[in-house]
């Protein structure tokens, strides 16, 4: 009874709090000639991959027999698996199981292939709150009884090594706080499986994360590594029509991160309603620092299972239609998998259909997800993962590969032609326009694009944030005007024409 009342009271307290606006001044973008690697890492368009089941255990991917199965019974949440192992083994022995798992997984990463062949820009690495500084911050949290195991297994040390290895290959890292205390959703990949998503209803959990755990991640892992592209503060938050707890936590988390490391992107979940969070980000003036993560799977819902593959593919431009004019989006997870019921309704060559499905997804993402995509997932303990695996999807030509090179040659005559075309169209329309703003816009865009290409042949991403900041700089330098739309059109035309392979 007391516990029930306490939970209701905590929920009431959170629901009465509105999220605060950004309280930190963000650093200005450098001019194109001074763009550094750290800035490009944070803004470039990503061709990425998830390291699923490395830290947050998922037995269907890795470690099923070695850690997650005890006396013939499989445990699909990490908390349950480690708790059961401790009934049979010492903390030292269970920690060794984990550290052996980390080593096996990491040793199998082919960095040369990732960098040179797949030409991946970034890794999304799911972690749990229990991994941060090897379990140092578990007081009053559900994983507290398992602290000693993580102290000995040293996942934080392994994460640091991964980040350094990625840096050597010019690969970025997105630290994804996949597992939150109480869970942001009801699934076992939150670390525990209680059947409820309690995190956003318990203020003590949210406070612990934004006051203690996020600062620890930043101070020990992100500040010293230029290839950290962002910090994801939640994974797959549940849909909520009135998400006051989410808004409270996100605003506190964003402000915590930006006070400690101004300019570090903060990634939030779309809660399966992209427009809801675009509106909120816009309202709170977070759009220059926040990226909204949306996951695209077409193999789980009854609605998708009822369709044939060709219908799903045809619908992608309509079903993946983020409001990208209002905010920056990334597809943090997607795959080439369709359900068996879908395949039962589909005729034709399966490999060809999977190829069309994956290629169409990537093409749609390139128009609406300004921070790119992260395929789920890198590798499996046994086999290549098939339509869940990066390697087979790359090797079959299903996923696009970025070309190599770092020297974009832009035809000056093409730029002059575009400028002339603009002037010719608008001249004689009855006003004295400011076509020089259009020219400034397209030339600034081209300079930025060339600067990005010089680092690992990167493309400009986070278009909403990038354009907004460049526009503000321009207005500050050359004053506002009723003809700023000409600059807007010029910069956008530059992106449309030249920010592509």
UniProtKB/Swiss-Prot annotation:
Q: Which keywords describe this protein according to UniProt?
A: Glycosidase, Hydrolase, Mitochondrion
Enzyme Commission number(s): 3.2.1.-
Which Gene Ontology molecular function entries are recorded, alphabetically? glucan endo-1,6-beta-glucosidase activity; glucan exo-1,3-beta-glucosidase activity
A Gene Ontology annotation in the biological process aspect, one of them, is: glucan catabolic process
Q: What is its main location?
A: mitochondrion
Where do the catalytic residues lie?
236, 333
Localized where? Mitochondrion intermembrane space
Q: Which GO terms describe its cellular component?
A: cytoplasm; cytosol; mitochondrial intermembrane space
- List the InterPro entries hit by this protein, alphabetically: Glycoside_hydrolase_SF, Glycosyl_hydrolase_5
SUPFAM superfamilies under this entry? (Trans)glycosidases
User: Could you tell me the superkingdom of the organism this chain comes from?
Assistant: Eukaryota
Q: What else is known?
A: Present with 1960 molecules/cell in log phase SD medium.
Q: Which family does it belong to?
A: Belongs to the glycosyl hydrolase 5 (cellulase A) family.
Q: What is this protein called?
A: Uncharacterized glycosyl hydrolase YBR056W
